[in-house]
């Protein structure tokens, strides 16, 4: 059967059978709706994939922490299991030892997903490339083509929106939890107290350095161990707007002082008579104000080196990172501008997006967005609308980041939306954060942080259960 001949009954077309597309197709079929799942492999392969299996894991076999009480990704695992996720079922069935993490046998995992989708009576798998916009007669489409979206489809999407619709290269600076920054060292101020669009004149957190600290920092950047480009990234050159911080440092010892770390227009209120030799600035990253990104600090340093080097910055000695920096090839949408809360393209609502293309990072995150996209697409087909889960849940917090929780920029300049892993910094703060332990003693330091995460997780699981009961007629996963 050719995929371009629509079945007699209503159907949703899902383009891309990675983790997000596979999960979307599964959720649509579970809701009793027919699905045509389009996968271009093996008709056309990519530089990253090695097989023609659905949901092939190309970079890692780890789904990261499975601790639902203390870790945001573990919490997302738990929510997805409650929602009957195929990806989580296949991961659990093909788990390999990895301590507290959920790691899987790659081949077994992909085979399980492929078998489940191939055997479902409402799912038709078509091996073909969709090399442009889907035909107009496809009125309900989920596009989940991932970071290696083919050029013809990417060009067609951009033609529907504008030149800034798609990015093809991540340039991600580290993002720090606001409450882990030492405010006895750092201070709020914009350069020259400038009030930019949406700003107050005190929009940046500033961390000062002496000359000795700056010199040691530059040396550490240059000496730090770097990540190599993957084979399919090597033909994507740096451009000056996203040079890695260590590449700038290699161009001359004073380069950073005349770039992102310039100390001009700022006065340290903790020591107003001493002018810092260099200053690291952090800018608010989300509307909640819980996350701050390190301005101009995109990097190819390995994660261990980033933690070691960036914690030498005054005020960041105890920094907790929501995500570390990176620079790699990726295709993703300017989702806060382009997508509605149901992940539909505002310029063409028949098209819904899912997975890494929307601006999430990680296997589990991509699959979870596919899960919601599938549920929403199925609801649309029967004339209903599905509100996203509350922002207090892991899935709702991630959707909120993608569709509106991120701020574009404080000062006029290029867009700043970047992909994000799930982390507790995306969640609304607790109304009454825990202050005492079960023994009645006041919580301090790490104990307070652990209690806060556990309270956020407990709230999330209660709220996802309530959302499922109110909006879905899905059995809970066993």
Swiss-Prot record:
User: For FAD, which residues are the binding ones?
Assistant: 16-21
Residue stretches of biased makeup (Basic and acidic residues): 438-448
Write out the annotated subcellular location: Cytoplasm
| BP GO terms, sorted | tRNA methylation; tRNA wobble uridine modification
Q: Name one GO molecular function term.
A: flavin adenine dinucleotide binding
Q: Name one GO cellular component term.
A: cytosol
Annotated segments matching region Disordered: 429-448
Q: Which UniProt keywords apply?
A: Cytoplasm, FAD, Flavoprotein, Methyltransferase, NAD, NADP, Transferase, tRNA processing
SUPFAM superfamilies reported in the protein's UniProt record: FAD/NAD(P)-binding domain
User: Where do the coiled-coil regions begin and end?
Assistant: none
Q: Which PROSITE patterns is this protein grouped with?
A: GIDA_2
This enzyme catalyses: uridine(54) in tRNA + (6R)-5,10-methylene-5,6,7,8-tetrahydrofolate + NADH + H(+) = 5-methyluridine(54) in tRNA + (6S)-5,6,7,8-tetrahydrofolate + NAD(+); uridine(54) in tRNA + (6R)-5,10-methylene-5,6,7,8-tetrahydrofolate + NADPH + H(+) = 5-methyluridine(54) in tRNA + (6S)-5,6,7,8-tetrahydrofolate + NADP(+)
Top EC group: transferase
NCBIfam families xref list:
gid_trmFO, PRK05335.1
Q: What function does this protein fulfil?
A: Catalyzes the folate-dependent formation of 5-methyl-uridine at position 54 (M-5-U54) in all tRNAs.
Record-stated family: Belongs to the MnmG family. TrmFO subfamily.
Name-wise, this protein is Methylenetetrahydrofolate--tRNA-(uracil-5-)-methyltransferase TrmFO
Species whose genome carries this gene: Rhodopseudomonas palustris (strain ATCC BAA-98 / CGA009)
Q: Which gene encodes it?
A: trmFO
